[in-house]
Regions:
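Alpha-helix N-cap/helix-initiation motif
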Residues: 2, 16-17, 180-181
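Short secondary-structure boundary/capping segments within folded domains
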Residues: 3-4, 26
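N-terminal Rossmann-like FAD-binding beta1-loop-alpha1 element of flavoenzymes
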Residues: 10-36
Length: 182
């Protein structure tokens, strides 16, 4: 394989949605090299661009963790991991603050307060953004931090280290070109 088709990095992230971008930025904060690969245009493909709300758990707003976790468990028909749900909620306010710092605007009331809407299914509250607000802000922040973004690459296979099953890379194919990338 030609060397120009081979890439090396400390962290490879497959998927350019909200989770992929947060993982990329947080890895760069630790000083490691990061490549983010996405089958479309990272930040504007998949489901993340359509998100117009964000659940930010904050005890200072009167939120109670048990109620939030119970709502997600019930609505998810108890197939989700409860500990993972708790962790996501406990980290959510910090991620909200990151989004604000990176330029994502959230809707406010006429009085200028943050607009929070409580779910009809339980105590969880959502914060709302204009349509397609997350993706461009996440992409801009990732690039600013030095994340290498590779758009329109379809990952075909994960590369495993001999014998122990550790993932050491991936093989991908550019969507609009011939050839493979490793």
């Amino acid at each position: 394989m030609p060397p120009e088709n081979m890439f090396e990095t400390d962290v490879l992230i497959i998927g350019g949605g909200m989770a992929g971008f947060f993982a990329a930025v947080k890895a760069r904060e630790r000083g490691v090299g990061v490549i983010l690969v996405n089958k479309g245009y990272a930040g504007q493909s998949g489901q993340s661009p359509w998100a117009d709300s964000f659940a930010a758990f904050n005890p200072e707003w009167g939120h109670e963790l048990e109620g939030w976790v119970n709502q997600v468990n019930r609505v998810g028909e108890y197939v989700n991991n409860r500990e993972w749900t708790e962790l996501c909620f406990l980290e959510s306010y910090a991620r909200y603050r990151d989004l604000v710092a990176w330029g994502v605007e959230f809707h406010r009331t006429e009085d200028g307060d943050l607009f929070r809407s409580t779910s009809s299914l339980g105590p969880c509250q959502a914060l709302f953004t204009p349509p397609r607000a997350h993706g461009p802000a996440l992409r801009k922040e990732a690039l600013k931090r030095g994340v290498r973004i590779m758009d329109r690459i379809m990952i075909l296979e994960l590369v495993r280290q001999d014998g122990d099953g550790v993932i050491t890379g991936a093989v991908g194919m550019p969507v609009a070109e011939d050839g493979f990338l490793v």
